[in-house]
Amino acid sequence: MARIAGVDLPRDKRVEIALTYIYGIGRPTANVILKKTGINPDTRVKDLTEEEVAKLRDEIEKNYKVEGELRREVALNIKRLIEIGCYRGIRHRKGLPVRGQRTRTNARTRKGPRRTVGVKRKK
């Protein structure tokens, strides 16, 4: 089993698809990596030689931020926004959409389940 950047790539999938299991690598990036290393995207992971796996590993480690390093950078960016108190930081802190979406209706993914506010009747 090919292990790159701490992720076990699925053996039966094509290399192009298998690389997307690594956080920070999508289809376009996977294709660029395969083009640079000269590996056919249609090759199955189980058919890769140790040399090809080493090439992929080197290319990804040298030129791309992936997995833990990328997650840490994203978390630090969000933390910085919160600390400086900018609009986006405030939206992150309140758990609201950050990119200008409407919140009067919708935005349920970001806001979580509804908390119904009831009214009290006079007795």
Curated annotation (Swiss-Prot):
Residues 99-123 are annotated as: Disordered. InterPro entries: Rbsml_uS13_C (IPR027437), Ribosomal_uS13 (IPR001892), Ribosomal_uS13-like_H2TH (IPR010979), Ribosomal_uS13_bac-type (IPR019980), Ribosomal_uS13_CS (IPR018269). It holds the Pfam family Ribosomal_S13. The keyword Metal-binding does not apply. Gene3D superfamilies: 1.10.8.50, 30s ribosomal protein s13, domain 2. It comes from the Bacteria. The keyword Transmembrane does not apply. GO terms for cellular component: cytosol; small ribosomal subunit. GO terms for molecular function: rRNA binding; structural constituent of ribosome; tRNA binding. PANTHER family: 30S RIBOSOMAL PROTEIN S13/40S RIBOSOMAL PROTEIN S18, SMALL RIBOSOMAL SUBUNIT PROTEIN US13M. Part of the 30S ribosomal subunit. Forms a loose heterodimer with protein S19. Forms two bridges to the 50S subunit in the 70S ribosome. This is Small ribosomal subunit protein uS13. It comes from Carboxydothermus hydrogenoformans (strain ATCC BAA-161 / DSM 6008 / Z-2901).
